[in-house]
Amino acid sequence: MNLIKTPVKGMRDFLPEEMQIREYVINKIKNTYINFGYNIIETPIVEHIENLSSNQGGENEKLIFKILKRGEKLKEAEDIDLTDSGLRYDLTLPLSRFYANNANNLSYPFKSMQIGPVFRAERPQKGRYRQFTQCDIDILGENSIMAEIDLITATSTLLNQFPINYTIRINDRRILSSMALYAGFKEEDIDKVLISLDKLDKIGETGVKIELLAKGFDEETIQTYLNLFKREVINSPQDYCGNLFNDYLEDNVIENLENIIITTKNTCNANIIFDPTLVRGMSYYTGPIFEIASPEFQGSIGGGGRYDKMISKFINISTPACGFSIGFERLVSILLEKNFKVPETKEKCVFIIEKNMPLIDILKEANILRNQNKIVKVMYRNKNAKHQKEILLEEGYTNIKEFFNNK
């Protein structure tokens, strides 16, 4: 049997040049969020299948990489009873389990930062992979809009360090639900309706209508709901909603959303707008939601929102929670397309030596430079020395020392 040299479909290898950019972005993320008081945590990539299939992950639950119970035959893999775990499809559900398990050892409220791989068994295409890195910040235990404001401020501070244009769109899941109830949908149908509405940007009003009709909903109700999104979009939830949905909305929902938008617009160097069509596909969102749009990438490059009911599914204690996820892979993709170069912070030196030369003195000198916080590479001279040095210069090795006959 011949071995296969290419990665599994939907997975990738990364060359040193791209890894340099990826590490640069991760370091920027860590340093920025640490300055806002977020604590780095880590959770396993494998989660209990019961957690992954708890109707919290929206469409992603259809994309779980399931893991068979040890020893079971591969041909029986489709039998769900034979799976007891799976690969995580995001970082939010694992964080909720983590907090429920460790709350007694954490500060309150707890500001979390987690960076790691997630897995979705979807059809690979440009910008979509089966394994990709997510970067999340979350605040657990903060019930006020201080959480949303802090998350948005920290994220805009991060994005402003990169050469990209972006807009942060903001809405509230409860406004979307109130509009659905006003149009005539039942409470128990709202999640199904919003899953279809979330595709409005991709398939348009006609596509959403066809999908909702296929789910068995009344055409008049569907059209009434869709017509609500044709109203003039004013950058104010209060002006947009008026008193139309008051019978279906909790107190202070619109007022709090107004305060989030006004505060962040005045404290962040970013374009922040109210967008009544913003949904976010995850059914676990319970309040304000936000998403980062960039004209340089089709689709969002990050998003998040409030999910106050998730942690209580693990422990019978109500715990408010809110998070923001940066689209790490998409951010890196934008930088690569711009031919972004990581700023050099250390001098790079290389010693090119003849073969069969004594190494002790040369390696000692290299270590002296490394102790001075310089990057030093020691290598033998190639037959094509000119080409060798050209490659080294491209890699940033500007200090090239050549040794001939131990000189």
What are these regions (language model features)?
Residues 21-36, 47-48, 79-82, 90-104, ...:
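Positively charged, Gly/Ser-enriched RNA/tRNA-binding surfaces
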Residues 60-76, 184-208:
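Acidic, His- and aromatic-enriched active-site or binding-groove loops in soluble protein domains
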Residues 165-176, 193, 273-279:
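Short, surface-exposed recognition loops or helix-turn segments adjacent to catalytic cores
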Residues 129-135, 170-178:
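Short, conserved phosphate-binding/catalytic loop or strand-edge motifs used
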Residues 1-88, 93, 149, 153, ...:
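TRNA-binding/sensing appendages of the translation machinery
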Residues 55-59, 182-184, 288-290, 392-394:
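Short low-complexity, flexible loop/linker segments enriched in glycine and/or proline
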Residues 177-182, 333-335:
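A short acidic (Asp/Glu
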Residues 1-15, 190, 195-243:
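N-terminal targeting/leader regions
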